[in-house]
């Protein structure tokens, strides 16, 4: 199974991806996480350092694939998760989609691409071009990371549009949304009402999730010294269990941009209407009585 994780830049995709990878490994699966970001820091919390990228390795070998060995590009991370960083072209030049393609090509050459139960692509920021939508060409499922904010949900909607487009020619489905570090989910619920899709999990506003990134550790590793964090790991295990159940998934129908802008902004600008809508059923019940 291959999974592509997308979401607004800075929303916590890499932190979430690493913890999901560990959760899948804890369920007995052989997992490979592929970072698809020029920053090459996707797997930092799994390995504890910035591993060399596929592109760096290929350049050092003058792109002679036959001179590259699995141990040159695949690094062992915490919890028996294997890690690869695709890297990216120089700033302002080249195409990120090409880099993803070269990464998959090399892993196939090394007979490594099909050795794993789960391959998880952690993809940078929003989908702004066909190049960075390239991981969707290989994925069975897409997971979108968001929070309860306007910008993150707007980005989620654009990603949903990319999933729908790719699903025309690939066996791709949207597994659902994951809310990351949010104290509320009212805006998420409002969006899902307009663009129906599963919500796999909503993680509460836990500071240790952010701190784990700085420490270069997953929550599963931190819990070894802080048992009180075990309940946080259960959120990721729940996501892993849903993925392993091979959900049917959906082909989303995104909300038009202007309509979504109006929907989400109205939620903040006219909170009274929202409150009244929530109270309507109670009023009706009272009238019936």
Swiss-Prot record:
Binding site for [4Fe-4S] cluster: 95, 129
Subcellular location: Plastid, Chloroplast
InterPro entries for this protein: NifH/chlL_CS (IPR030655), NifH/frxC (IPR000392), P-loop_NTPase (IPR027417), Protochlorophyllide_ATP-bd (IPR005971)
SUPFAM superfamilies according to UniProt: P-loop containing nucleoside triphosphate hydrolases
Organism of origin: Marchantia polymorpha
Protein purpose: Component of the dark-operative protochlorophyllide reductase (DPOR) that uses Mg-ATP and reduced ferredoxin to reduce ring D of protochlorophyllide (Pchlide) to form chlorophyllide a (Chlide). This reaction is light-independent. The L component serves as a unique electron donor to the NB-component of the complex, and binds Mg-ATP.
GO terms classed as biological process: light-independent chlorophyll biosynthetic process; photosynthesis, dark reaction
This enzyme's EC code(s): 1.3.7.7
Cofactor(s) recorded in Swiss-Prot or TrEMBL: [4Fe-4S] cluster
The gene coding this protein: chlL
Keyword annotations: 4Fe-4S, ATP-binding, Chlorophyll biosynthesis, Chloroplast, Iron, Iron-sulfur, Magnesium, Metal-binding, Nucleotide-binding, Oxidoreductase, Photosynthesis, Plastid
Listed name of the protein: Light-independent protochlorophyllide reductase iron-sulfur ATP-binding protein
């Amino acid at each position: 199974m291959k999974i592509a994780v997308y979401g607004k830049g800075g929303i916590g995709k890499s932190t979430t991806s690493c913890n999901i990878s560990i959760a899948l490994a804890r369920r007995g699966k052989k997992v490979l996480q592929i970072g698809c970001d020029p920053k090459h820091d996707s797997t930092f919390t799994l390995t504890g350092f910035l591993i060399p990228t596929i592109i760096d390795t290929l350049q050092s070998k003058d792109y002679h694939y036959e001179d590259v060995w699995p141990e040159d590009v695949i690094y062992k991370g915490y919890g028996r998760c294997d890690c690869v960083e695709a890297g990216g072209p120089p700033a302002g030049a080249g195409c990120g989609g090409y880099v993803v393609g070269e990464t998959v090509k090399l892993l196939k050459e090394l007979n490594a691409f099909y050795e794993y139960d789960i391959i998880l692509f952690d993809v940078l920021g929003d989908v702004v071009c066909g190049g960075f939508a390239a991981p969707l060409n290989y994925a069975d499922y897409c997971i979108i990371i968001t929070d309860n904010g306007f910008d993150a949900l707007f980005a989620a909607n654009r990603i949903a549009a990319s999933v729908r487009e790719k699903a025309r020619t690939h066996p791709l489905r949207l597994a659902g949304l994951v809310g990351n570090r949010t104290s509320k989910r009212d805006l998420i619920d409002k969006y899902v009402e307009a663009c129906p899709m599963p919500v796999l999990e909503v993680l509460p506003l836990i500071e240790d999730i952010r701190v784990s990134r700085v420490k270069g550790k997953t929550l599963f590793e931190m819990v070894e010294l802080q048992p009180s964090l075990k309940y946080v790991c259960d959120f990721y295990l729940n996501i892993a269990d849903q993925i392993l159940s091979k959900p049917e998934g959906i082909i989303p129908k995104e909300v038009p941009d202007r309509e979504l802008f109006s929907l989400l902004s109205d939620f903040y600008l006219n909170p009274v209407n929202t409150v009244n809508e929530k109270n309507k059923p109670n009023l009706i019940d009272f009238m019936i009585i």
